[in-house]
Design a protein with these regions (language model features):
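Formylglycine-dependent sulfatase
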Residues: 1-245
């Protein structure tokens, strides 16, 4: 790391509730790597998302603006290119901000043409970041990685996240998905991140590492599908009566 220049790893996860983070009170869960990150890093206990779903939430996180100001009010709504964001700001101070994962950003239509394929998907990458392992909407990179690893993809590639023999999410299930844990999308992101960081040497870096999980479908690979028993989970936080809710 260059003198006076910090290395920064920003990990963004999708739909992980704060009250299900062990270091923040969810002692019934086992997440040793996350525990270490919280222990050796900084945990912002009062940091809350300002918007839903994921695209608007990421727009707020990375621009520092409320939804009413950046106006990307739902997935596929374009983000105005005039807004400063974290990637652009980092470039101004000499970083080359890298991104693994995704930001669910639809481009400003004034910067491209109407046939731009990014308008036909749930979003692309936010300006300012350099992709070093994007989880593009078609997921071609991840599926190609699986094939290169020798995993036989089903005819409908997305079925890897379903239990064997199912063609739709079967509701609440403890059956494992078809892809093994070592070939999960989380493993893919982690491998790409480690490869990128090992190649940086002593140069300062900023890496936005965006994981897809625990985003649905809620079908985990073995052995994680059987790690917890439903009976051991805490009851939902409810009001005293349906009328109060």
């Amino acid at each position: 790391m260059a003198a006076g220049r910090r290395n920064v790893l920003l990990i963004v996860v999708d739909q992980w509730r704060a009250d299900f983070v062990p270091r923040l009170g969810a002692g019934f869960l086992r997440t040793p790597n996350l525990d270490r990150l919280c222990r050796e890093g900084v945990a912002f206990r009062n940091h809350v998302t300002t918007a839903v779903p994921c695209g608007p939430a990421r727009a707020s996180l990375l621009t520092g603006l409320y939804l009413m100001n950046h106006r990307a009010v739902q997935n596929t709504v374009p983000l105005d290119t005039r807004h400063m964001n974290l990637g652009k700001a980092l470039r101004l101070i000499g970083y080359d901000p890298a991104l693994i994962g995704y930001t669910t950003t639809t481009p400003d239509p004034r910067t491209t043409g109407p046939r731009d394929p990014r308008f036909t998907s749930l979003g692309d990458l936010m300006d300012g970041f350099r992709s070093v392992g994007a989880f593009e909407p078609t997921m071609d990179g991840y599926f190609g990685w699986l094939a290169q690893k020798g995993f036989r993809l089903p005819e409908r590639r997305e079925d890897i996240w379903l239990p064997e023999g199912e063609d739709a999410v079967p509701g609440a299930t403890d059956r494992p998905c078809r892809v093994p844990a070592e070939l999960s999308d989380s493993a893919y992101f982690t491998e790409r991140a480690l490869a990128y960081l090992k190649g940086k040497g002593g140069k300062p870096w900023f890496l936005h590492l965006g994981y897809y999980r625990p985003h649905p479908p809620f079908v985990a690979p073995a052995p994680y599908n059987a790690m917890y028993r439903p009976a051991d989970m805490p009851a939902p936080v409810r009001r005293a009566s349906p009328a109060e809710e």
